[in-house]
Amino acid sequence: MSHLAELVANAAAAINQASDVAALDNVRVEYLGKKGHLTLQMTTLRDLPPEERPAAGAVINAAKEQVQQALNARKAELESAALNARLAAETIDISLPGRRIENGGLHPVTRTIDRIESFFGELGFTVATGPEIEDDYHNFDALNIPGHHPARADHDTFWFDATRLLRTQTSGVQIRTMKAQQPPIRIIAPGRVYRNDYDQTHTPMFHQMEGLIVDTNISFTNLKGTLHDFLRNFFEEDLQIRFRPSYFPFTEPSAEVDVMGKNGKWLEVLGCGMVHPNVLRNVGIDPEIYSGFAFGMGMERLTMLRYGVTDLRSFFENDLRFLKQFK
């Protein structure tokens, strides 16, 4: 047992001399490893009489436990010293500004949609939605555009088959709403629409918003007043606005609305008109009792005018240098 005490003393000395965790682990292997000095002491038990083996084994285990505790304590000291050394080596200038958090931002077209929804929401309009894969009845026929009508050719439609298509306008939402509920109706219908066209001012997919009111005694004066208020609110200017006679199959009379630009030229911003009696009849609403007005506008077009963007395609190219300007 005197030899055992000597081993413990030697282990303690080696532990205290270990300068880092790696050196300490070498001491652990030397004394407590599979072939370590203290581990091999267990093999001497077979040379003892059976009645002495339990007591001798307990002494060896106590010695191993003593060394293990010394190893744990020294390891904690070394790890703490290493941490303190790293912290001391680090220099932090607390006068430097913190790292800026990169906040996200809304896409400019989304900003436009939200702004318009907010304005019309205050006038009592609700937001209505519908499918982007539409049938020709809701996209054309019910809107007074039968199969032989030349206006169908103007839409550059993406067809799936003879009756299914990617909607070219959100007017189908108006048809579905009027079929589902009786007047009074007051909705706006924002959403993606699709036309086979691509250049500086057109993309195959773009965003449109249409508005619809159907009630008794709705007149063109109501339409003009609503759109005057909207355009001046949207552009935040006392704009000069004009209504030009135009033609749309689903409204009569129809008009296109222009605003005076900063360059002294008129800029087209939207189309509108009184809901055609045929459209009301197609959805089961009596045009002798009810009347209404509708309007439609391109979200990208309005966004370009509001922010001075010259190329429509910029909205879809995901260029962060462009998008960050609207944060």
Curated annotation (Swiss-Prot):
Mind telling me which InterPro entries this protein's record contains?
aa-tRNA-synth_II (IPR006195), aa-tRNA-synth_II/BPL/LPL (IPR045864), Phe-tRNA-synth_IIc_asu (IPR004529), Phe-tRNA_ligase_II_N (IPR004188), Phe_tRNA_ligase_alpha1_bac (IPR022911), Phenylalanyl-tRNA_Synthase (IPR002319), tRNA-bd_arm (IPR010978)
What superkingdom does the record give?
A: Bacteria
Enumerate the Gene Ontology biological process terms: phenylalanyl-tRNA aminoacylation
Q: Which GO terms describe its cellular component?
A: cytoplasm
Which Enzyme Commission number(s) are on file for it?
A: 6.1.1.20
The name under which this protein is listed is Phenylalanine--tRNA ligase alpha subunit
Organism annotation: Salmonella typhimurium (strain LT2 / SGSC1412 / ATCC 700720)
User: What keywords would UniProt list here?
Assistant: Aminoacyl-tRNA synthetase, ATP-binding, Cytoplasm, Ligase, Magnesium, Metal-binding, Nucleotide-binding, Protein biosynthesis
Q: What does the similarity note say? A: Belongs to the class-II aminoacyl-tRNA synthetase family. Phe-tRNA synthetase alpha subunit type 1 subfamily.
Question: How many cofactors are bound and how?
Answer: Binds 2 magnesium ions per tetramer.
**Record's signal peptide:** none
Q: Where does this one sit in the cell?
A: Cytoplasm
Tell me what reaction this enzyme catalyses: tRNA(Phe) + L-phenylalanine + ATP = L-phenylalanyl-tRNA(Phe) + AMP + diphosphate + H(+)
The gene it comes from is pheS
Binding of Mg(2+) occurs at E252
Could you give the subunit structure recorded for this chain? Tetramer of two alpha and two beta subunits.
